[in-house]
UniProtKB/Swiss-Prot annotation:
PANTHER family (UniProt xref): ENOLASE
Cofactors that this protein relies on: Mg(2+)
Signal sequence range: none
Listed HAMAP family: Enolase
GO biological process: glycolytic process
Organism: Desulfosudis oleivorans (strain DSM 6200 / JCM 39069 / Hxd3)
Gene3D superfamilies per record: Enolase-like C-terminal domain, Enolase-like, N-terminal domain
Assigned protein family: Belongs to the enolase family.
GO molecular function, one term: phosphopyruvate hydratase activity
Designated name of the protein: Enolase
Keywords: Cytoplasm, Glycolysis, Lyase, Magnesium, Metal-binding, Secreted
A Pfam family matched in the record: Enolase_C
Pathway: Carbohydrate degradation; glycolysis; pyruvate from D-glyceraldehyde 3-phosphate: step 4/5
EC number(s) per entry: 4.2.1.11
Length: 426
């Protein structure tokens, strides 16, 4: 009663008003699953390919009609009759049907939509919540949230070069308490920015996008907001950065246009080291560019003993690339994005590799999101440790936090909040 009998895709809009793919899967016993695919703004060059129509007169070239057609006419018929609880078989079949290294024939957005919807349909068939279906009896750890409250870089039209300034409510004992702490700091920050005459409009991921004079000024505002909200920086609430350094890497130099600086790889690491010495920065993501592979080892050696060094663009959730990074000592954490690799199975493989190698994992959204909260269930199902899903505003971000609160309630006394961080006081 779990055979796939119908696969139906459609074009919907994401949180930026751009088209994306949504897929419904129906099984022989009547179970159903629905999934919507996210989309990134700052993307790694080796990510699985998101198929767009490129017809400029329709959605300015960003339509996904071809990806939808591929699901409805090519992928669906091949999967009919296949058991939905054989996720690896389903995903391998789609990968084989595509036949390219980066899923460019059918589109990673087409393949991922089906992969996620199949997992949901199988969970429905077994009458299990998605997190329980994915993780079995071991699914009980809620992820520590990284909350992006100041946006810069490709996520905002301001002078900040660093893309995300996040808070981590390390002093929280439950996910509900973490969400409350984050919301209180977020709203306190809004008042502080407004009092200083800065705009409080939000960026793609729900964080504020003030036009500040430097990256350090943004950290200063966050420090003040933490204190004014009644929390201790480092002990109660830490700070994390996503530099997205590939976005400002030009001809072998890191060009911080907002600060008028042009830095070598070593100087860029010096820059981070100075910030870490002054502030409770617990995690730095994509501190160097994906093209600057060799210097990632240097950065990890210098900063990795005290700071989580997260690889996003440098690994793109790709098990083959990640395996090389593990072997060479790059980073000590990996960002996990479903649409970077394009199937649930390959995502689970990357997470398993990280755990075996002693890397932490951060389950992540994209800047273009929908109301789909799949990653919340995924984070709990795989005991992911951390989740990065935006600020404490915009319903596309809040949907994930709310789902985590529901899961925590369902787990009851068995729920455990993960905390990969040691309290840091600076």
């Amino acid at each position: 009663m779990i055979e796939i009998i119908e696969v139906q895709a459609r074009e919907i809009l994401d949180s930026r008003g751009n088209p994306t793919v949504e897929v419904d899967v129906t099984l022989s016993g009547g179970a159903t699953g629905r999934a919507a695919v996210p989309s990134g703004a700052s993307t790694g060059t080796r990510e699985a390919l998101e198929l767009r129509d490129t017809r400029k007169k329709r959605y300015l070239g960003k339509g996904v009609e071809k990806a939808v057609e591929n699901v409805n006419t090519l992928i669906g018929p091949v999967l009919y009759g296949m058991p939905a609880d054989e996720q690896f078989m389903v995903d391998s079949t789609m990968i084989g049907l595509d036949g390219t290294a980066n899923k460019s024939k059918l589109g990673a957005n087409a393949i991922l939509g089906v992969s996620m919807a199949v997992a949901r349909a199988a969970a429905d068939a077994y009458e299990l919540p998605l997190y329980r279906y994915l993780g079995g009896i071991h699914a009980k750890h809620l992820p520590m949230p990284m909350m992006n409250i100041v946006n810069g870089g490709a996520h905002a039209a301001n002078s900040l070069d660093i893309q995300e300034f996040m808070i981590i409510p390390v002093g929280g004992k439950t996910i509900a308490e973490c969400v409350r702490m984050g919301a209180e700091v977020f709203h306190t920050l809004k008042k502080l920015l407004k009092a200083k005459g800065f705009a409080t409009a939000v960026g793609d991921e729900g964080g504020f996008a003030p036009d500040l004079e430097s990256n350090e000024a943004a950290i200063g505002f966050i420090m003040e907001a933490i204190k004014k909200a009644g929390y201790r920086p480092g002990r109660d609430v830490g700070i994390a950065l996503d530099a997205a350094a590939s976005e400002f890497y030009e001809k072998g130099k890191y060009v911080l246009k907002g600060e008028g600086k042009k830095l070598s790889s070593k100087q860029m690491v010096d820059y981070y080291e100075n910030l870490i010495d002054k502030y409770p920065i617990l995690s730095i993501e994509d501190g160097l560019a994906e093209q600057d592979w060799d210097n990632w080892v240097m950065m990890t050696d210098r900063l990795g003993n005290t700071t989580q060094i997260v690889g996003d663009d440098v690994f793109v959730t790709n098990p083959a690339i990640f395996e090389k990074g593990i072997r060479e000592g790059l980073a000590n954490s990996i960002l996990i994005k479903l649409n970077q690799i394009g199937t649930v199975s390959e995502t689970l493989q990357a997470i398993d590799m990280a755990k075996q190698a002693g890397y932490t994992t951060v389950i992540s959204h994209r800047s273009g999101e929908t109301e789909d909260a799949f990653i919340a269930d995924l984070a709990v199902g795989v005991n992911g440790g951390q989740i990065k899903t935006g600020s404490l505003s915009r319903s596309d971000r809040i949907a994930k936090y709310n789902q985590l609160i529901r899961i925590e309630e369902a787990l009851g006394a068995g729920a455990v909040l993960s905390n990969d961080f040691t309290a840091v006081v600076r």
